[in-house]
Swiss-Prot record:
It comes from the Eukaryota. This is Orotidine 5'-phosphate decarboxylase. Its EC number is 4.1.1.23. It comes from Candida glabrata (strain ATCC 2001 / BCRC 20586 / JCM 3761 / NBRC 0622 / NRRL Y-65 / CBS 138) (Yeast). The active site is at K93 (proton donor). GO terms for cellular component: cytosol. Pathway: Pyrimidine metabolism; UMP biosynthesis via de novo pathway; UMP from orotate: step 2/2. It catalyses: orotidine 5'-phosphate + H(+) = UMP + CO2. One of its GO terms (biological process) is 'de novo' pyrimidine nucleobase biosynthetic process. The keyword Cytoplasm does not apply. Pfam families: OMPdecase.
């Protein structure tokens, strides 16, 4: 795992979007990604405005919004990202052949490539998925875009481990500029070959150990000790009975302290 600071990594990173993210993490002293699975735009925007000061990244699932529109959802989200200085990660989990994912990324109702700084994909269909998504990004926008590969998941019984994970890492090696890292539970190596992958870890909780649908939680210190760079937190920030502002600062501080401990500060 990396013992370099976020700023050191930002200055040397080959990906413009990864460099931008690492830099704002350093500036805001946060490695918290808020995963906000709500079903209306008003709920989403309210939570984003409250949590914005504490996060480096917002993770969305726009296909669960019952009232999604560019004018009323994407435009204010982008304005809040500028106001609070965070990036947007649409958790689309693409998993088809290259031409199909390119169309899913650029077209349809959501036109993800136009507004999401980062998206992600499964490795199950092979290297073509990276090529297709990169082409889609290049043909849609001049803004920097990045892709995360799903190497490991936090759900009980996940098949994403062992040879599957190794194969996904091999796919990531095909594009140093566009593939910026992984959704994973631990460090994925690569530094000896010149890669500096960002590791983003879901299933992080300071209080809960799991849920009835197979989610398994690990503590902030645990995930940083095995190589994470960014913690993805959802219900821990806004579930019933929790104050998003209080929890946002609590997770921000826990993540930042764990990062400082790892780099020896």
């Amino acid at each position: 795992m990396s013992s370099a600071s976020y700023l050191q990594r930002a200055e040397a990173h080959p990906s413009p979007v990864a460099s931008k993210l690492l830099k704002l993490m350093h500036e805001k002293k946060t490695n918290l990604c808020a995963s906000l699975d709500v079903t209306t735009t008003s709920e989403l925007l309210k939570l984003v405005d409250t949590l914005g000061p504490y996060i480096c990244l917002l993770k969305t699932h726009v296909d669960i919004l019952s009232d999604f529109s560019f004018e009323n959802t994407v435009k204010p989200l982008k304005e809040m990202a500028a106001k609070h200085n965070f990036l947007i990660f649409e958790d689309r989990k693409f998993a088809d052949i290259g031409n199909t994912v390119k169309l899913q990324y650029t077209s349809g109702v959501y036109k993800i490539a136009e507004w999401a700084d980062i998206t992600n994909a499964h490795g199950v269909t092979g290297q073509g998925i990276v090529t297709g998504l990169k082409q889609g990004a290049e043909e849609t926008t001049n803004e920097p875009r990045g892709l995360l590969m799903l190497a490991e998941l936090s759900s009980k019984g996940s098949l994403a481990h062992g040879e599957y994970t190794k194969g996904t890492v091999d796919i990531a090696k095909s594009d140093k500029d566009f593939v910026i890292g992984f959704i994973a539970q631990k460090d994925m190596g690569g530094r000896d070959e010149g890669f500096d992958w960002l590791i983003m870890t879901p299933g992080v909780g300071l209080d809960d150990k799991g849920d009835a649908l197979g989610q398994q939680y690990r503590t902030v210190d645990e995930v940083f000790s095995t190589g994470t760079d960014i913690i993805i937190v959802g219900r821990g920030l806004f579930a019933k009975g929790r104050d998003p502002k209080t929890e946002g600062e609590r997770y921000r501080k826990a993540g930042w302290d764990a990062y400082l401990k790892r780099i020896g500060n």
